[in-house]
Amino acid sequence: MKTDAHKNVQKKVGEKAGLIDEKTKENYFTIEVTNATLASECTPRVGSAPLAPTRSIFLILDINATLAADVADKVGGDPEESYMPLVAETFSVATEQGTPDRNVTSETAWGCFDDSVLLPPVVNPGQTVTGKLVLAVEVTQGRVAYDPQENGGWSWPYGD
């Protein structure tokens, strides 16, 4: 298993990542970046004029995520509070110096696309969700990481 300098397991675009139940060896959470596109503008949620990034460029991710219905049984805790966050704040990119840039949100990135095509903010037990997530980034090539607890997650390439 190849990891980057920030303890994120490296994946290819289209390759699933996930958390595995040690007993059953089955995934109870999966996340997959199926496409990573750079864009100098996006279609707005409201209005018709395209939005431009306030940072260098938009990084538009197409993501699939699934959370098992019985996740609370596997990890313990309250089923009502068992979910995985999918908001922009759980993602980062590496700066040119190699440090994580967790400031990948912006008002214009949030304003991109209609809600019907956007990734929901969480995946709940028993759900599979699909959608776009727009990040505001400075670096046009590198790796985008999903690491909600900032202790090691997964990363996918972009801008290649």
Mark where each language-model region is.
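Conserved functional micro-motifs across diverse proteins
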Residues: 1-160
